[in-house]
Amino acid sequence: MRRGLMGWNAEELPVATLEARLTRLRAAMAKASMDAFVIYTNNTRPSAVHYVTGFTPYWSDALMLVPKAGAPVFATALSKRVSEWIRTTDPLSEIVNTPKPGALMGERLTKDNSVKRVGVLEYDTLPSGLADDMAAAAPAVEWTDGTAMFTGLRREVDQSERGLLARADAMAAAALGEAEAGKASDAGTLAGLIEQHARLAGAEETYIAIAHDLAADRRLNRTSQPTPLQDRFAVRASVAYKGCWIRRTRTFAKDAGAAKADSWFDGVARSLEPGKPIAAQLAAKLKELPGAALTSWIAESCTGSYPLSAVASSRAPGKDAPVNGQFLVLTVELTLDGAPWLGAAPLIVGQGAL
């Protein structure tokens, strides 16, 4: 269950922005010959519903129905006592409390005789109980996967989303500064200090992972144990603000190599170009960092119901040309003069850092 404050701020996320997103979604639906669109959500898959409505699901299963016209319908198994709170964070939808969201979705669809074909985001991962209930209540409907359509819609961010991402990034960057303050000598204490800093700044959720001895093990782990920090360690902060997630990773070391790699990586994040393979861009940029060898990289973005998912990586060459205006979190692992270094930062392709 989420622990941070969740609320809707009309200045940060105006109703006009949500209405514009809904209009774009309906235009994409029409182009794909979909008469309605269904999105499944829970506490680990909140992002698609948040993008359309502003509401961040925090527990339980729920379904959202986007019809061709009229208000979206958000059907949740949560009790009625939270309905009013949901309404304060979702200014567009009709909120319905029901123990069987799938059956309700199907019943709503059958009331409109023009509905023949319905898209479902990430159809293959829709829980079978909900899928069965929808199909039983609307046996004449043709169900189809709408993931590609929605992914195309999410390739560019609007100004409101960019502002929320920038706010989350500022929280993460400032919180990681706790590692420079010398307040902690062990991983558990440092993780607590970083999380505390981010939450007091307004973070909705945080996940802190640490590689306490980067020279021995590059894996980043969530920990509360008093494991001593070594001369070279790395910290990753995944932070959410108003439903928008970012990641930052930094390497901390007593030598000057980490700072040189940080400066290089900042330039990479600010200069990533659209239409060109990320692998080729990194290879070219690596020439500007003498003594460096690239180990791996991954680019993540929010394209569906999950906050961040891999969209390109060093494991899948040839499919990594980003789109102008696309939000990415770029993570790079390299060695500099034989010493390991990890870094991650958010960016907008073709427009630089957030």
Predicted regions located by residue number:
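Active-site neighborhoods and metal-handling regions in enzymes and metal-associated proteins
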Residues: M1-L354
